[in-house]
Amino acid sequence: MRLVLLFVLLLPVCLATRFHQKGLFDFMIEDEGSADMAPTDDPVISGFGPVCPFRCQCHLRVVQCSDLGLERVPKDLPPDTTLLDLQNNKITEIKEGDFKNLKNLHALILVNNKISKISPAAFAPLKKLERLYLSKNNLKELPENMPKSLQEIRAHENEISKLRKAVFNGLNQVIVLELGTNPLKSSGIENGAFQGMKRLSYIRIADTNITSIPKGLPPSLTELHLDGNKISKIDAEGLSGLTNLAKLGLSFNSISSVENGSLNNVPHLRELHLNNNELVRVPSGLGEHKYIQVVYLHNNKIASIGINDFCPLGYNTKKATYSGVSLFSNPVQYWEIQPSAFRCIHERSAVQIGNYK
């Protein structure tokens, strides 16, 4: 009789549909009727493994607790967690001990909460954390004592008004830094704040109130995005030392001049975005630049194009040909431009002119 009863109890388990994960955030079991399961106030226990916080989904060391209206970080998170997703909740504070025992965590997603305070010791246990996403919160400053293992920090759409050098000290592994859409001013960026970030390759400080290129940017930088700010001019000092820079975004500012020699400081530049500014002429130095391929100058006040503005005086001195030059929505008339001004551009479709109103 006991054997029959045991067989009856085990039969549903044997016939259960297997879970097939299709992607990193695919946590739903494709099983008909699974949505009819009654919720429980008890934590979910999977086999003999760690407890999964109530209402969260746990699989393959990924813990997803997003879109649950949480007001604090769940307790008793599985210690083997490598990715913790807490986005789209109502968390206001990150406290010391919230991430205790999560020594294997690689990615922490805290996007779109109401976080205004982070304890200086909150991230202390996270010795292996590589990606920290803090965007769309209420932070006034970046937290101190961020893990030295970090490679990516994203904190756009906060209330950050200061960037202190001490915050970035020791963050030698950071490659990506995103700080756009914050009430940040040039005076709020401490001189040399980013110098200690020896591997920093990508930085975006767009849609803020800065009026100049931050000083002391590391030479490792390959992409610098400063679009949508209040920068009025580019001087040579602002680009000094950026010998590895390949992409520079300065669109939607108020730039009226680019100092002579500025582009000499970025010898490996390939893309220059200066559209939607107040330029009255093509920046000097483009003709002599060997590697630049894309130049966006549309929506400015350029009234004339010089014969040597884009191409060098001699032939075969430019190592890379242009793949895109945009000049539309400028006062210059296309019939006033000498054809030889584009003599180093092999594809006619690479040049866009006209449509000025």
From Swiss-Prot:
It comes from the Eukaryota. It is found in: Secreted, Extracellular space, Extracellular matrix. Residues 1-16 form the signal peptide. Glycans are attached at residues 46, 209, 260. The attached glycosaminoglycan chain can be either chondroitin sulfate or dermatan sulfate depending upon the tissue of origin. InterPro entries: Leu-rich_rpt, Leu-rich_rpt_typical-subtyp, LRR_dom_sf, LRRNT, SLRP, SLRP_I_decor/aspor/byglycan. Residues 17-30 form a propeptide. LRR repeats lie at residues 71-91, 92-115, 116-139, 140-160, 161-184, 185-210, 211-231, 232-255, 256-279, 280-302, 303-332, 333-357. Disulfide bonds join 52-58, 56-65, 311-344. Pfam families: LRR_8, LRRNT. The keyword Disulfide bond applies. GO terms for cellular component: extracellular space. Keywords: Disulfide bond, Extracellular matrix, Glycoprotein, Leucine-rich repeat, Proteoglycan, Repeat, Secreted, Signal. May affect the rate of fibrils formation. Binds to type I and type II collagen, to fibronectin and TGF-beta. Forms a ternary complex with MFAP2 and ELN. Belongs to the small leucine-rich proteoglycan (SLRP) family. SLRP class I subfamily. This is Decorin. The gene is DCN.
